[in-house]
From Swiss-Prot:
Pathway: Amino-acid biosynthesis; L-lysine biosynthesis via DAP pathway; (S)-tetrahydrodipicolinate from L-aspartate: step 4/4. The gene is dapB. GO terms for molecular function: 4-hydroxy-tetrahydrodipicolinate reductase; NAD binding; NADP binding; oxidoreductase activity, acting on CH or CH2 groups, NAD or NADP as acceptor. (S)-2,3,4,5-tetrahydrodipicolinate binds at residues 156, 165-166. This is 4-hydroxy-tetrahydrodipicolinate reductase. The active site is at residues 155, 159. It comes from Geotalea daltonii (strain DSM 22248 / JCM 15807 / FRC-32) (Geobacter daltonii). Pfam families: DapB_C, DapB_N. It catalyses: (S)-2,3,4,5-tetrahydrodipicolinate + NAD(+) + H2O = (2S,4S)-4-hydroxy-2,3,4,5-tetrahydrodipicolinate + NADH + H(+); (S)-2,3,4,5-tetrahydrodipicolinate + NADP(+) + H2O = (2S,4S)-4-hydroxy-2,3,4,5-tetrahydrodipicolinate + NADPH + H(+). Its EC number is 1.17.1.8. NAD(+) binds at residues 8-13, 34, 98-100, 122-125. Its main location: cytoplasm. It is found in: Cytoplasm.
Length: 267
């Protein structure tokens, strides 16, 4: 039985992950972590998540929570995730990170911290989204430079980072397939007289509003035809189930930084 702890246990995603752990075979909730001073510290994590008493109280002691688990699932912020990754590395515990908004420098730091433990870092834990990553790579290679690429992502009005980590990863996948440097060709802003679109650029548009869980569409636009590859999240449960799947997979793996493509065997 894999002992799984959850960071951000009182949040929306944290609660759905707790439910997913109780529904998964071969996994059990061993700890629930929140920031120091959180008003729900001391509450039963299962009751809060709506799945009944689990006799696991929400704690603000990261060392105790990490010590008692095999793997920590973290959906917080890059700053907190790196702190948790460091704590797991010190105690030789695995970690699954679903936080988004990492800078290139933070990704490098994450890889360095994961040299001694197995860690999964993925902007999206959905099976469907990760299948889209594979499809995008194949489509981009086939179409080559004859099609312009534009990405549009939509999320709820509470999302803090833009564009989404999933949208950025989609752009990176396409850029890699086309032999381009994503950081040089990504275009996040068009306004006024900005000139003609370059052939190499990958456009990125962000929409925020209401309670949209997450929608992503990649447009391959050619002369007289257009291909659209879309994914729409109807519930957060696909993210929570994916994170638990990753948690069960990563325990016992060789040290290093993995992603959901590794978890799903898509590489």
């Amino acid at each position: 039985m894999v002992k799984v702890a959850v960071c951000g246990a009182a949040g929306r995603m944290g609660q759905r992950i707790i439910v997913a752990i109780t529904e998964a075979e071969g996994a059990e909730l061993s700890g629930a972590l929140e920031r120091p001073g959180h008003p729900l510290v001391g509450q039963d994590a299962g009751i809060l998540a709506g799945c009944g008493e689990l006799k696991v109280k929400i704690s603000d002691d990261i060392n105790a929570v990490v010590e008692g688990c095999d793997v920590l699932i973290d959906f917080t912020t890059p700053k907190v995730s790196l702190k948790n990754l460091e704590a797991c590395a010190l105690k030789k515990k695995s970690i699954v990170i679903g936080s988004t908004g990492f800078t290139p420098e933070e990704r490098v730091l994450a890889a360095e911290l994961a040299r001694d433990i197995p860690a999964v870092l993925a902007p999206n834990m959905s099976v469907g989204v990760n299948v889209c990553f594979k499809v995008l790579k194949d489509v981009a290679k086939t179409l080559g430079d004859d099609f312009d690429v534009e990405i549009v992502e939509l999320h709820h009005n509470k999302k803090k980072d833009a564009p989404s980590g999933t949208a950025v990863r989609m752009g990176e996948v396409v850029a890699e397939a086309l032999g381009r440097d994503y950081n040089k060709v990504a275009n996040y802003h068009r306004e006024g007289i900005c000139g003609e679109r370059t052939k190499e650029e990958i456009g990125m548009q962000t929409v925020r509003g209401g309670d949209i869980i997450g929608e992503h569409t990649v447009y391959f636009i050619g002369m007289g035809e257009r291909i659209e590859i879309s994914h729409r999240a109807m519930t957060r449960d696909m993210f929570s189930r994916g994170s638990v799947r990753a948690a069960k997979w990563v325990v016992g793996k060789k040290p290093g930084l993995y992603d959901m493509q590794d978890v799903l065997g898509l590489k």
